């Protein structure tokens, strides 16, 4: 059965057709609407899906935010242009005319990456560092979503009680410091207004402030991983996202994690499916894997 998989992120929307063997075809991307209206997201999704829907039998959505009974509830509304409450499943069922499943993007990615690991791995955590910071937890071979869909939102754990205010309302969240948006917000002087991609370029050129911002992000993520190891005793952690997969970033996270006491060490690896993990995980779930 062919699935129309959709990935809704803070900066881009992606869609593709995925067959029963998880082969991806006709991948398309559009920027996430900058305007803060449900209509803008609805129209963007319609434009994304329209060329693909005739060849699909079902829709699977991986989206940033909390998915609760088919509704998209943004824990940090800034990551989706201010959206607080959006009828995601209903909207796609109307646009595509197909049965639709929705799950958090990091949870979906965790499920895809879990299936790529050796069979003896039963406990793993996926972390995405991108516009925001998210996560997905697989425990004893089962994906944890939580009754309210909140499970795995690791970016909203505490990094610095005196840090910046996060879009979720807490002070000093991991996401507020380590995410691409958090790094950009902290940039000053000649880096003010730069996005995360530019900060990585400048860091590679030796710019002191840019190097500090990247290093600070990596250290915050490493400390969060130590907390995750203490909480879940996971066998491995897989890292994805545009920041997480940036050149040299994983190596910095690994170096900072090695500075933590030995019980908190855990194997780290880059996402095998890279930017397609959310699409593939959602398709896996729609094709019969249960939450």
From Swiss-Prot:
List the cysteine pairs that form cystine: none
Query: Which reaction equation describes what this protein catalyses?
Result: an N-acyl-D-mannosamine + ATP = an N-acyl-D-mannosamine 6-phosphate + ADP + H(+)
Which residues are involved in binding Zn(2+)? 156, 166, 168, 173
Q: In which pathway does it act?
A: Amino-sugar metabolism; N-acetylneuraminate degradation; D-fructose 6-phosphate from N-acetylneuraminate: step 2/5
What processes in GO biological process is this protein linked to? Answer: N-acetylneuraminate catabolic process
Q: Which residues bind ATP?
A: 5-12, 132-139
Q: Name one Pfam family in it.
A: ROK
Q: Which InterPro entries match?
A: ATPase_NBD, ManNAc_kinase_bac, ROK, ROK_cs
Q: What is its EC number?
A: 2.7.1.60
Give the keywords, sorted: ATP-binding, Carbohydrate metabolism, Kinase, Metal-binding, Nucleotide-binding, Transferase, Zinc
GO molecular-function term, one example from the UniProt record:
zinc ion binding
The function of this protein is: Catalyzes the phosphorylation of N-acetylmannosamine (ManNAc) to ManNAc-6-P.
Q: How does it assemble?
A: Homodimer.
Q: Which family does it belong to?
A: Belongs to the ROK (NagC/XylR) family. NanK subfamily.
Name of the protein: N-acetylmannosamine kinase
Origin organism is Salmonella heidelberg (strain SL476)
Q: What is the lineage of its organism?
A: Bacteria, Pseudomonadati, Pseudomonadota, Gammaproteobacteria, Enterobacterales
Gene that this sequence comes from: nanK
């Amino acid at each position: 059965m062919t699935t129309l998989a959709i990935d809704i992120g803070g900066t881009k929307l992606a869609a593709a057709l995925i067959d029963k063997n998880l082969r991806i075809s006709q991948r398309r991307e559009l920027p996430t609407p900058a305007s803060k209206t449900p209509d803008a997201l609805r129209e963007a999704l319609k434009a994304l899906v329209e060329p693909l829907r005739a060849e699909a039998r079902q829709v699977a959505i991986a989206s940033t935010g909390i998915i609760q009974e088919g509704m998209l509830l943004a824990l940090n509304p800034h990551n989706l242009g201010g959206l607080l409450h959006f009828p995601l499943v209903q909207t796609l069922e109307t646009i595509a005319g197909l049965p639709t499943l929705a799950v958090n993007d990091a949870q979906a990615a965790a499920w895809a990456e879990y299936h790529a690991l050796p069979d003896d791995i039963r406990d793993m955590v996926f972390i995405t560092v991108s516009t925001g910071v998210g996560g997905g937890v697989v425990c004893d071979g089962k994906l944890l979503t939580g009754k309210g869909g909140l499970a795995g939102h690791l970016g909203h754990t505490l990094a610095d009680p005196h840090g910046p205010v996060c879009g979720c309302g807490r002070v000093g969240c991991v996401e507020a410091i380590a995410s691409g948006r958090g790094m950009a917000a902290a940039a000053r002087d000649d880096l003010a207004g730069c996005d995360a991609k530019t900060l990585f370029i400048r860091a590679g050129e030796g710019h002191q402030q840019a190097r500090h911002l990247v290093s600070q992000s990596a250290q915050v993520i490493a400390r969060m991983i130590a907390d995750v190891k203490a909480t879940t005793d996971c066998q491995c952690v897989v890292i994805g996202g545009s920041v997480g997969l940036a050149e040299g970033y994983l190596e910095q996270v690994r170096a900072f994690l090695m500075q933590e006491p030995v019980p908190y060490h855990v194997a780290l690896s880059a996402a095998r499916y890279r930017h397609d993990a959310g699409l593939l995980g959602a398709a896996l779930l729609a094709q019969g894997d249960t939450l």
